[in-house]
Amino acid sequence: MGKYKLILIGSFPPPVGGVSIHVKRLKENLEKSNLSYLVVDIKRDGLKTALKSVFKGNVVHLHTSSVYLKCCFSIFCLLVNKKLLLTYHGNLNRYGQLKNSLDKFSIKIAHVPIVLNRSSLEIATRINRKSVQISAFIPPSEIIELDNETIKKIKDLKSRCSVTFCTNAYNVSYDKSGGEIYQITALIELFNGMPERGLIISDPSGMYIKLIKEKDIHYSDNILFLSFIHDFNAIIRDTDCMIRFTSTDGDSLSVKEALFAGKPVIATNIVERPAAVTCIDNNMHALTAAVSSFKPHFVENYTENGFSELYRLYCEN
């Protein structure tokens, strides 16, 4: 028996990202529970420390976007007879042949693979019958307010635009076809031609504004970049609609945070989305039609919380 019931291994902000925010909120909820646990930040503590921590617990829950780390921990936990719960924070089969094969290998030998949508569950259960689908969304415990200068910029943008949208990209990432996953340059092109509609781009890593400058891409004054660390929930709250124009996805944290705030969402239909989302095809024609016809409205607040299902899984194992 290990000293702890659970060893939680993952990355924490900064940098800000869907996985790191999920792990941070998971830890915050564990602090309120009666479960004995140990948290390891794999980026700061290192791989060696993370592997050593496995011996201290009965159940290991790993959060990583690296297919290589997923395979490494799957093999290691199998060899030392530890139960590995492994969350796949993206749509399965989104990589090329090698990485997809490695993902499937780790699914096969993990104790319980956890996926985020129905299409991934169909793939995972064919490989490992213990696979489960659990939402990555855990509601935020607080919203960190924006600084006064940023608030002023947003107010100015809203005063000049009839409708204000927001989108986010934690970094510049590309899909297996070489296209932008977040398709920010396509959004810029669209909003450059819609001066009456505003767009706030959450770019906490600063990588997108760097790319835009390097490529000398023009963006008009109805587009506002926020290229510093901030709470995207504060942006969602102050805009009319959130756009998720991605070429691939998992269980988007941003989509559910917008719905949790009662805000409408326009998103590509490349994965299963919550019922309240306006789903569009992944092309500019569909995006243009959705943005140009959008009228501000309130949606029923999203009430899902993935922590309760995860907690049950921890207790059962």
How should each PLM-predicted stretch be described?
Residues 210-228:
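Nucleotide-activated donor-binding/catalytic signature segment of Leloir-type glycosyltransferases, i.e.
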Residues 108-155, 159-160, 164-168:
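Donor nucleotide-sugar binding/catalytic pocket of nucleotide-sugar-dependent glycosyltransferases
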Residues 264-268:
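Short hydrophobic beta-strand element within catalytic cores of glycosyltransferases
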Residues 281-317:
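A charged, aromatic-enriched C-terminal amphipathic alpha-helix characteristic of glycosyltransferases
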